[in-house]
Amino acid sequence: MSVSEIFVELQGFLAAEQDIREEIRKVVQSLEQTAREILTLLQGVHQGTGFQDIPKRCLKAREHFSTVKTHLTSLKTKFPAEQYYRFHEHWRFVLQRLVFLAAFVVYLETETLVTREAVTEILGIEPDREKGFHLDVEDYLSGVLILASELSRLSVNSVTAGDYSRPLHISTFINELDSGFRLLNLKNDSLRKRYDGLKYDVKKVEEVVYDLSIRGFNKETAAACGEK
């Protein structure tokens, strides 16, 4: 094989990979659009009357996740399953955003942390890499950390809306998250930096709870703060 033939063959490989990446990008754009729609819907809980609409907004968000499932099913067909990490950077950020959105819905519904397995059911993907298109552990953790930031904001807006018990519940939840993350030996630089922001979320929520306790707005909050 001549030098020119070698490079012609290599160009064929490069062109084929570029075609795959372009197909992936198209699906990811659709995923990003649906994620924005879900986020816009859930952001409404921060408004004055948004707390009254939480069940309705969560139900509507779950309907949007059926569209997410469709897009992810399409994405799976765009590349060989064994090459997941070769193209992972294309959907990594939107998948982390979708984890956050799924976790936010579950928290609003039950005030609990969604498991990685439950997220994969909501998204219609696999929990284990051996089974193909899956939810990477670090992507799940990144989504959970985004949730913590969102909940710290919600604690402030809860007070504005006159819901004085919610910040206490959020404080308990975020402190449990912080304790959980302390058990992990995080090697990923991006994940470590995002985890560094969790302490500020914890502090922000604790300040809200403390402010409520000294102002006597909530007996439950005051009693909890007195126990600390």
From Swiss-Prot:
Q: Check the record and name the SUPFAM superfamilies matching this protein.
A: Translin
Task: Quote the InterPro entries the UniProt record gives.
Answer: Translin, Translin_C, Translin_fam, Translin_N, Translin_sf
Localization per Swiss-Prot or TrEMBL: Cytoplasm; Nucleus
The primary location reported for this protein is cytoplasm
What CDD domains does this protein's entry cite? Answer: Translin (cd14819)
- Assigned keywords, A-Z: Acetylation, Cytoplasm, DNA-binding, Endonuclease, Hydrolase, Nuclease, Nucleus, Phosphoprotein, RNA-binding
For molecular function, the Gene Ontology terms on record are: endonuclease activity; identical protein binding; mRNA binding; RNA binding; sequence-specific DNA binding; single-stranded DNA binding
Please give the residue positions where the record annotates the modification Phosphoserine. Answer: S190
Q: Where are the N6-acetyllysine modifications?
A: K187, K199
UniProt record, GO biological process: regulatory ncRNA-mediated post-transcriptional gene silencing; siRNA processing
EC code(s) of this entry:
3.1.-.-
Region entry DNA/RNA binding, spans: 86-90
Q: Name one GO cellular component term.
A: male germ cell nucleus
Q: Share what the entry says about its subunit structure, partners included.
A: Ring-shaped heterooctamer of six TSN and two TSNAX subunits, DNA/RNA binding occurs inside the ring.
Q: Which family does it belong to?
A: Belongs to the translin family.
What the protein does comes down to: DNA-binding protein that specifically recognizes consensus sequences at the breakpoint junctions in chromosomal translocations, mostly involving immunoglobulin (Ig)/T-cell receptor gene segments. Seems to recognize single-stranded DNA ends generated by staggered breaks occurring at recombination hot spots. Exhibits both single-stranded and double-stranded endoribonuclease activity. May act as an activator of RNA-induced silencing complex (RISC) by facilitating endonucleolytic cleavage of the siRNA passenger strand.
Name of this protein = Translin
Q: Say which species the protein is native to.
A: Mus musculus
The lineage, from the top, is:
Eukaryota, Metazoa, Chordata, Craniata, Vertebrata
Give the gene name: Tsn
